[in-house]
């Protein structure tokens, strides 16, 4: 792969840590953090903010899956999980915590580089999907605001739907701002005006009843 990554590695075995520190630069990557426990990995990732994590599962004080979950809560990054054996339950946990690749020891050089590329590509795809979902949610919220403001203009100014929308567009153009910003201003102004209107209605004298 062309991209050079800053990588954090964690394993309770010194030989494995040394191996990863030696082999990753051969792919053009920089090892920025090395840890022997899960908690140490979490702390070093907070300090270094790596692009990718390669971590063993079985480690003292906090296993690799729990450490990866904690790291990704702080800032999402791709994680490659390493284990001495296949374990169905561990794989299910790993899936829940968004582990993007899984390697079984002994790690071969021919397997490591593709795993890094796959994890990075999957992470970028997931991030794009999350952003798309966030954009969609924001678009729906914006549409709701605009519809509410349009309905308010129809009620207050006696406009039909098209006229109300054109007025929103004209106001946005005059103020050089987005349609949703104009809608928010109109709704905010209405919220401020409602107590005044209610007080005025309350103090307005009622109809006189004829006497005699």
Predicted features along the sequence, with ranges:
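Two-component/phosphorelay signaling modules centered on CheY-like receiver
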Residues: 6, 13-33
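Acidic catalytic/metal-coordinating carboxylates
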Residues: 37-40, 61-66
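Receiver (REC) domain switch/output surface
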Residues: 95, 112-124
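Active-site beta3 strand of CheY-like receiver
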Residues: 47-54
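C-terminal output helix
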Residues: 89, 107-116
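C-terminal output/effector regions of signal-responsive regulators
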Residues: 124-125, 131-212
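Alpha4 helix (beta4-alpha4-beta5 surface) of REC/receiver domains from two-component response regulators
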Residues: 66, 86-102
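Active-site residues of response regulator receiver
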Residues: 56, 83
